[in-house]
Amino acid sequence: MPDTLRFLVTGAAGFIGSHLSEALVDQGHAVVGVDCFTDYYHRRTKLANLARLRKAKGFRLVETDLSSGRLSPLLKDVECAFHLAAQPGVRASWGKSFSHYVKDNITATQRLLEALKDNQIKMVYASSSSIYGDSERLPTPEDTPPRPVSPYGATKLEAEHLCYIYFRNFGVPVVGLRYFTVYGPRQRPDMAFAKFIAGISRGKEIDVFGDGEQRRDFTFVKDIVTGSMLAINAKPGTVYNIGTGKTTSLNEVITTLESIIGKKARVKRLEVALGDVRNTSADITSISRDLGYRPTTSLAEGLRRQVKAQLLE
């Protein structure tokens, strides 16, 4: 990779997008950050995510909607695009809300690919472990047949299909990354760890869906960013998992948070939510072999960093 490049980062004001944008700017690259500031969570949270970036010389923020705005001007002199913008959330993707997922996860991706195809700009697409559904293969390799069990997972898979279609038919150099449960500072307020930390620290009940023995491959945001940046040099048309290859139960996470915060959790058990899967685990053999990816942050250390950042906000 050249010493300096110009990147487009969609979803730049979000949890992962803001960390990725910072890492790129810190390496001396120029970043055009795009975000439409949906009402999924409060605008001030996203603006806080951008606090350091907005002071950086190499960062420019553009507020626009990928599903309807003019995209060609955003791509001027851009050499690589990271497409992280999406409507997140498994549990919120049912019913009337589904139209938002179609617009932001499918239509927006198709329009960006259209804009990229004439310029042959490389795109790294942020997909999700949700496309696998309740996989019986654990750890789950990339060649596992996708069977999403939520509308959210279905829209992320459809966006992957669009990426392949534009790669196959127009030669758009796309690389797909399937992120496994990301956590860390700036985690969205609707996500489990953010809710657990807020509840435990304030002595309030925290909701746990099911028995808490469901296991996830929890991946620290810094490791996600590292893997994403390595994908700049990946072969177009490839798809990689980004995780740790290790799993932890929700009950174990809660016990660790109790130790870090110094308070006992008040757990409220609820029925398993629609679209939730029992276990996830990333097989990271391919990305480790091809790109040299190595996750470096233990869950305990990552949780300590998230607790510190969240309680200091």
Pin down the residues of each PLM region.
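Hydrophobic alpha-helix immediately C-terminal to the catalytic Tyr-X-X-X-Lys motif of short-chain
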Residues: 158, 162, 166, 196, ...
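N-terminal Rossmann-like NAD(P)+-binding domain of SDR-like oxidoreductases, especially those catalyzing
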Residues: 1-182
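A short, amphipathic alpha-helix embedded in the catalytic core of nucleotide-handling enzymes
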Residues: 112, 166, 195-200, 227-231
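Conserved active-site region of classical short-chain dehydrogenase/reductase
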Residues: 106-114, 190, 222-225, 229
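C-terminal substrate-binding subdomain of Rossmann-fold SDR/epimerase-dehydratase oxidoreductases
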Residues: 20, 200-313
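Conserved hydrophobic/aromatic "anchor" residues
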Residues: 15, 125, 132, 180-183, ...
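A conserved pocket-lining segment of Rossmann-fold NAD(P)-dependent short-chain dehydrogenase/reductase
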Residues: 93, 143-145, 172-185, 196-219, ...
